[in-house]
């Protein structure tokens, strides 16, 4: 699962999300003081502290976290990840590269699952050979005049993709909480941990572990008999989870930075 990159396309959106959240919460208590638009704008631009944000995000009123969307780009994750993450449909929108309109002949690449990355070279070669064979057949079909959409059925699930995800802060926290659980697939966990890491860096209060992480970080596991029985420390931030669960990726990242 190396060579997967994530980026927040509208970093300003997090600041606006915080401001809108505070404004919406204050509005419920100051309706009697607002006589005109000028009064409303004064309330909107009223300053606030990080403690104010902390108090509001801890309340059981998620609507105030839904007045802004944060857009994230994911480059290099597989189309299998696409199939999994798009199960989330509330307050979230997606735009993906298209097999119908794109010609991947000579340009396609495939993701390597973390389990295969850890395996012996012989196993890695079997996987790579299988994926490359599929991509070669795809290119051959396109060269024979088959349309890209039809030829796309020959591509492997591991085909790398480009995906844009736009969601409210509340929905990001919901998706991250569900998809960073240790019962999820490695690729989905890795992508969502990287996204969480970027969001946490910009707003460690809004995306704190006890508000964003899997059930075991927020309180206790809700999977009951399906629990992995290996809870994540409530103190860990996303980078700590990546280091503990995916050390091979961290070593490769460090090595690439040195190079």
Model-derived regions: residue spans:
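Family-specific signature for flavin-dependent thymidylate synthase
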Residues: 1-259
């Amino acid at each position: 699962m190396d060579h997967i990159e994530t980026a927040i396309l509208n970093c300003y959106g997090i600041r606006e999300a915080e401001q809108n959240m505070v404004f919406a919460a204050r509005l419920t208590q100051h309706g009697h003081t607002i006589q005109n638009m000028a009064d409303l704008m004064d309330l909107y631009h009223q300053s606030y502290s990080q403690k104010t944000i902390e108090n509001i995000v801890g309340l059981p009123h998620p609507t105030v976290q839904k007045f802004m969307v944060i857009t994230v780009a994911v480059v290099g994750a597989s189309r299998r990840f696409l199939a999994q993450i798009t199960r989330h449909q509330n307050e979230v929108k997606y735009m993906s590269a298209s097999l119908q309109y794109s010609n991947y002949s000579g340009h396609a690449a495939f993701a390597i699952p973390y389990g295969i990355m850890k395996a012996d070279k012989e196993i890695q070669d079997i996987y790579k050979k299988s994926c490359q064979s599929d991509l070669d057949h795809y290119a051959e079909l396109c060269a024979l005049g088959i349309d890209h959409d039809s030829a796309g059925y020959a591509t492997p699930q591991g085909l790398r993709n480009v995906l844009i995800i736009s969601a409210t802060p509340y929905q990001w926290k919901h998706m991250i909480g569900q998809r960073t659980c240790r019962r999820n697939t490695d690729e989905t966990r890795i992508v969502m941990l990287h996204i969480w890491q970027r969001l946490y860096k910009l707003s460690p209060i809004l995306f704190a572990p006890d508000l964003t992480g899997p059930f075991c970080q927020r309180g206790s596991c809700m999977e009951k008999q399906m629990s992995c029985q290996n809870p994540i420390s409530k103190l860990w931030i996303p980078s700590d989870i990546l280091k503990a669960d995916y050390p091979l990726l961290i070593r490769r990242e460090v090595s690439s930075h040195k190079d």
